[in-house]
């Protein structure tokens, strides 16, 4: 997914022509073609040193990285510390959005619909589960895609999942399971304003663990406008968000629920760029650097993809 997003955004920057691009590439991906003006290989031994040098040489940086384990926030801070402007959210807002419990509290404090959720550890899991009720979903406090998320139908299943290393000696979320359509929103944020570009269907396999399989862009239905409104309200809750972000949603019979905020480029970018009437890389630059949002955005057609076919 990361490589597919990188290729897509580099192609869009080249099509725009407004900047020259330098990208890093994992040393294990030497055969991966990239449409950057310059490609710099990264290895674990020189990772930070190379990034610090590049940050000092560039005007701005767009980071494609997971927010789990503080990776995205740390890389964002590294870039800012070495003089680069971010084509995206600052490290503080990334850290807030990456914390699913912090997001849940922001949603509830703002009166946004979101599934009942408890913050728990292994010792308090059964008591928290009684409060939520089965079936429920267990998820790490931070994570990307469907990483570490499982559907728990009963107490024995909860005990089984808690024995896994991911949840040993760590806190996690237990969340009420709601039947519905898994969806996401793609947004641009500029200053205090934001614009929802699309609502997307997510193809999720509900299993132990959940598995993200792909997306369809755009996704429309009778709750389309409600989903847009919810996504825009959610995006406004975290100060400092900027550029492209995603908001995960659940569209149920009774309404829409906010799940979490993704303060970064999301995989749906790949589908969105194929149906939108603007250059998304240029739009990200203008939102992040100039605080300008595009006007007269139109989506034409649909684009569906499966994760295994991205590269």
Predicted regions and their residues:
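Short glycine-rich anion-binding loops that position phosphate/pyrophosphate groups of nucleotides
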Residues: 66-69, 142-143, 264
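A short glycine-rich, hydrophobically flanked beta-strand micro-motif that places a catalytic Asp/Glu
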Residues: 241-253
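Short catalytic helix/loop segments, enriched in acidic residues and glycine
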Residues: 1-13
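Conserved protein kinase catalytic/activation segment
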Residues: 255-257
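Conserved N-proximal alpha/beta basic substrate-recognition cap immediately N-terminal to
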Residues: 12-13, 23-122, 127
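Active-site nucleotide/adenylate-binding loops and adjacent lid/helix of ATP-dependent enzymes
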Residues: 94-181, 189-194, 216-229
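ATP-dependent carboxylate/phosphate-activation module, predominantly the ATP-grasp catalytic core
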Residues: 176-239, 251, 262-288, 299, ...
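A structural signal for isolated positions on well-ordered beta-strands in alpha/beta enzyme cores
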Residues: 20-22, 195
């Amino acid at each position: 997914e990361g490589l597919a997003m990188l290729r897509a955004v580099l192609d869009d920057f080249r099509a725009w022509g407004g900047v020259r691009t330098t990208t890093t590439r994992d040393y294990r991906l030497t055969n991966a073609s990239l449409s950057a003006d310059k490609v710099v290989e990264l290895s674990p031994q020189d990772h930070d040193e190379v990034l610090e040098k590049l940050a000092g040489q560039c005007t701005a940086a767009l980071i494609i990285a997971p927010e789990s384990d503080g990776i995205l926030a740390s890389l964002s801070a590294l870039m800012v510390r070495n003089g680069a402007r971010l084509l995206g959210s600052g490290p503080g807002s990334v850290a807030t959005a990456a914390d699913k419990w912090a997001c849940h509290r922001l949603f509830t404090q703002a009166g946004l619909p979101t599934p009942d959720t408890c913050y728990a550890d292994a010792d308090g899991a059964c008591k928290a589960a009684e409060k939520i009720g089965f079936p429920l979903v267990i998820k790490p406090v931070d994570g990307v895609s469907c990483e570490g998320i499982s559907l728990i139908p009963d107490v024995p299943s909860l005990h089984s999942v808690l024995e896994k290393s991911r949840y040993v000696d760590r806190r996690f979320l237990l969340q009420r399971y709601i039947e519905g359509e898994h969806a996401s929103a793609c947004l641009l944020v500029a200053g205090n304003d934001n614009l929802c570009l699309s609502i997307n269907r997510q193809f999720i396999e509900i299993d132990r663990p959940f598995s993200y399989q792909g997306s369809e862009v755009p996704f429309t239905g009778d709750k389309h406008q409600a989903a847009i409104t919810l996504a825009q309200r959610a995006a406004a809750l975290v100060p400092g968000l900027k550029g492209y972000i995603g908001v995960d949603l659940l569209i149920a019979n009774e309404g829409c629920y906010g799940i979490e905020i993704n303060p970064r480029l999301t995989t749906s970018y790949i589908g969105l760029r194929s149906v939108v009437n603007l250059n998304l890389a240029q739009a990200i630059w203008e939102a992040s650097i100039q605080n300008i949002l595009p006007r007269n955005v139109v989506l034409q057609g649909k684009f569906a993809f499966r994760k295994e076919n991205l590269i």
